[in-house]
């Protein structure tokens, strides 16, 4: 009878350098190695912590002020984290006090904005804390070049994606973008999502929004995300729509030409044979 080693490495081990996904974990007997099991539990704990981490909106507001950006601190109709998680509908609307504060601001600053900029904690305040400022810096470089007017950064605690529609409507904005923490994954507890809407108003569904996902250092870069967002904004203004009828066809320069990419072949199979 042939004996097999107790510990075994996966032949796909070399591919682990290409992805944070849990592949090529190996085995110990009929189970995972201890290191892989502990790493899984640690990643799961990180994801849970990201969901429950409080949104430091005051700290983010202070950092924005240091960069010369005004901000407004608002709250959704969800009074706390428990109600936010149990009642998604409450996170989609502003509280009565916040809605009135925004109306008062709009009355004092008539004329509206081209773009309402909203930041909400979503399901990962960690993502917002890490990525909001560097992304906004890249985005504002490009919006300034287009001559678009931006609202103060509206910080919404316990907010969900659709809360940006109410913010945009109350501010009289032509477009809105909300930066929001995405649902944490086991390899990405700090993924930031961008949701863009043309002519925002209360009651719009996801079909009217465009999403740019996984904005973080290990995912979509800040510059690339800003480039895609600006493309959507230009096309939305030209075609006067957003959502499923507006496709992201932004041309992105790559390090390799198409011809070079074809010569590489499938990375799983190695270079093509002559």
From Swiss-Prot:
Cofactor: adenosylcob(III)alamin
Cofactor mode of binding and number, as noted: Binds between the large and small subunits.
InterPro entries for the chain: EutC, EutC_C, EutC_N
Name used for this protein in its record: Ethanolamine ammonia-lyase small subunit
Gene this chain is encoded by: eutC
A single GO molecular function term of this UniProt record: cobalamin binding
Binding sites annotated in the UniProt record for adenosylcob(III)alamin: 161, 182, 211
GO biological process entries: amino acid metabolic process; ethanolamine catabolic process
Keyword annotations: Bacterial microcompartment, Cobalamin, Cobalt, Lyase
Source organism of the structure: Pseudomonas fluorescens (strain ATCC BAA-477 / NRRL B-23932 / Pf-5)
EC number of the protein: 4.3.1.7
């Amino acid at each position: 009878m042939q004996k097999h080693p107790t510990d075994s490495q996966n032949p796909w081990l070399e591919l682990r350098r290409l992805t944070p996904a849990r592949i090529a974990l190996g085995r110990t007997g009929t189970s995972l190695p201890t290191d892989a099991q502990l790493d899984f539990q640690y990643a799961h704990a990180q994801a849970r912590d990201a969901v429950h981490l409080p949104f430091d909106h005051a700290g983010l507001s202070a950092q924005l002020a240091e960069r010369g950006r005004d901000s407004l601190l608002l709250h959704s109709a969800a009074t706390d984290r428990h109600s936010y998680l149990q009642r998604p509908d409450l996170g989609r609307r502003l509280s009565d006090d916040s809605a009135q504060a925004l109306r008062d601001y709009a009355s004092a600053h008539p004329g509206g904005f081209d773009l309402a900029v909203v930041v909400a904690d979503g399901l990962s305040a960690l993502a917002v804390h890490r990525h909001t400022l560097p992304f906004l810096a890249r985005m504002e470089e490009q919006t300034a070049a287009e001559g678009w007017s931006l609202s103060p950064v509206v910080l919404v605690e316990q907010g969900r994606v659709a809360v940006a529609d109410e913010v945009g409507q109350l501010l009289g904005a032509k477009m809105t973008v909300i930066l929001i923490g995405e649902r944490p994954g086991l390899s990405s507890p700090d993924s930031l999502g961008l949701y863009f809407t043309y002519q925002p108003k209360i009651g719009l569904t996801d079909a009217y929004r465009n999403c740019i996902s996984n904005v973080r250092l290990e995912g979509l870069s800040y510059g690339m995300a800003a480039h895609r967002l600006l493309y959507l904004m230009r096309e939305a203004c030209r075609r006067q729509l957003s959502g499923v009828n507006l496709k992201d066809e932004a041309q992105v320069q790559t390090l390799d030409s198409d011809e070079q990419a074809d010569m590489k072949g499938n990375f799983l199979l190695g270079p093509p044979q002559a």
